[in-house]
A protein has these predicted regions:
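General secondary-structure propensity
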Residues: 2-6, 52-55, 61, 192-196
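Short, basic/aromatic-enriched C-terminal tail that caps enzymatic domains
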Residues: 227-228
Length: 228
């Protein structure tokens, strides 16, 4: 009977089946809670409670309302044991921080960190990058685990990338930079894009910084190890 919150709009059926099997109190996005919003504010509705006129979360990214909706569902599910006031929720949305999730470091060139490490997260990252506006050149530092299906990840963001810096990561579970570059080369159709390999994320980032102009953009993603 313990609550399980699923904010994925299209959750795996196995998750739903397992929650049902163990008798969990399953909260599904779109069934038990949802949100609406415009450019100025948003609202949330759960099983027995509603919030209106909420400010957008302080985090950047197109998927933040989905994430925030899941948090509000968790608070609603636990309200009898851990009551939280509406004002506390409003304050939390305004002050929330999550390093490494579409984290933009101001400066020249612009620097973006994102721990996106699957196709769904990279799709959100790509949408967010596209919304940032024009940059003459986008440099990408990329490292990933060996068990990840990196081909669709690279293909999704590739139209925005002008220079790749593939890197090894400090764990045996990681794919080698040369392996990542080979996957990229197999799917690359743009002859104007350059790529290089590096021994670690810092070396790759140093190379990107050295090559970038002040008006360019550098993006670091693929793993917590890459961003960390």
């Amino acid at each position: 009977g313990r609550p399980v919150i699923v904010s994925d709009p299209v959750p795996p059926q196995s998750v739903i089946d397992h929650a049902t099997e163990i008798g969990a109190d399953l909260w599904l996005f779109g069934r038990d809670f949802n949100f609406t919003g415009d450019k100025q504010q948003w609202g949330w509705a759960g099983r027995g409670r509603r919030y209106s006129g909420l400010a957008y979360p302080a985090l950047r990214g197109a998927n933040q309302l989905v994430n925030a909706s899941g948090v509000l569902a968790a608070l609603e599910a636990l309200r009898s044991e851990m009551p939280v006031t509406a004002q506390a929720i409003r304050n939390g949305l305004a002050m929330v921080e999550l390093p490494g999730r579409f984290q933009i470091v101001p400066g020249q060139p612009a620097l973006v960190f994102d721990v996106a490490h699957n196709a769904h997260a990279v799709a959100a990252l790509t949408e967010n990058l596209d919304a940032m506006g024009f940059y003459p050149t986008t440099h990408v530092v990329f490292g990933a685990m060996a068990d990840k299906d990196v081909a669709p990840m690279l293909a999704r963001v590739a139209p925005l990338v002008d220079r790749w810096y593939f890197c090894d990561l400090p764990t045996e579970r990681a794919a080698k930079a040369t392996q990542l570059q080979a996957v990229w080369q197999a799917g690359n159709a743009r002859k104007d894009v350059q790529a290089s390999t590096h021994a670690n994320p810092q070396a790759a980032l140093d190379a990107a910084v050295a090559a970038a102009d002040p008006t360019d953009r550098i993006v670091v993603f693929g793993s917590f190890f890459t961003v960390g």
